[in-house]
Amino acid sequence: MADLDLAAIYLAVRDRMCAAIAAMPVADAETIVPACPDWTVHDLLAHQTSMPAALIAGDLPTGVINEWIQGLVDARRDTSIDDLLAEWRSDDAALGGLVANVGILVGDLVAHEGDLCGALGAVADRTAPESEAMLPGALAGLQGPITEAGLGAIEVRHGDRSWRTHDAEPGWSFEADPWEAFRALTSRRTADELRAAAHTGDVEPYLAVLDAHLPLPTASLGER
C-alpha cells in the first residue's frame, strides 16, 4: 500500500458515508446493518467515528480487540447522529495522518461503506476505485492463515487482470470484479455464494480459512 494515498481514499469514502447518513430519514438510524447484524446504522457510524478518535487520543486496545471496539460503540450509544457526524469530520489533518499509517482502518471503512449501502437499500457504486485499491491488502491479510493451513494462494481474476494473496501457485482462483472480490474476501458472501462463483480449484478448505478469519454470513446479504 506504500504507493496509495490512504488518507485521500479514507476521506473520500468518509465524505460519501457522511452524505448518505445525513440525507437518510431519522428512523433509519435504528435500521439493522445486514452485514453486521449486531449493529444498527447508528452503531456503524459510532464505530467509524470512535475508533480513529480513540487511536488519535492514544486509547489503544489492550485486550480482546472486538471487546474494545464494542466498548467504543457502546460509549456513544446516546450520541446523536449529527454529533457523530460532526466528530468524524472535526479534524481531517489528524485523521489523515492516522490512516496514512494504518491501512487496516481504510480497508475497514471501505468494507463498511458497502455495509451501509446494504442497510439503507442503496445501490453501491461497483466502479468506485477504493475497493480495487484495498483488494491487495485484503488478499495479503489472508496469506498467513492460508500458509498455516498448507494451502496455495487465493487468486482473483477479472478480465486480463489478476491479484494473489502471495507469490505462490493458486489453490483457489475465482472470477470477480474488484468490488465483488473485496466483498467476498471480507466475509460478505455466504459459503454457498462463494461455491457458486466461477472458479478453479477446491474452494472448501478456503471457506474454512475465511470463516475462521472473519465468520461468513449464514444468509445472503442480497447484494447481487
For every predicted segment, state its role.
Residues 1-12, 16-19, 55, 63, ...:
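Soluble acyl-CoA-dependent acyltransferase catalytic core bearing the H(X)4D motif
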Residues 2-35, 40-46:
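N-terminal "assembly arms/tails" that initiate or stabilize quaternary assembly
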Residues 2-7, 28-37, 60-69, 97-224:
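Structured surface interface patches that mediate subunit assembly and partner/cofactor docking
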Residues 13-20, 51, 87, 91, ...:
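Amphipathic, well-ordered alpha-helical segments in soluble domains
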Residues 21-25, 52-59, 120:
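A generic secondary-structure signal for well-formed alpha-helical elements
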Residues 40-41, 80, 177:
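Short, structural beta-strand-to-alpha-helix junction motif
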Residues 41-68:
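Conserved alpha-helical segments that form or flank metal/cofactor-binding pockets of metalloenzymes
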Residues 73-91, 97-100:
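A short, structured beta-strand-centered segment in the mid-to-C-terminal lobe
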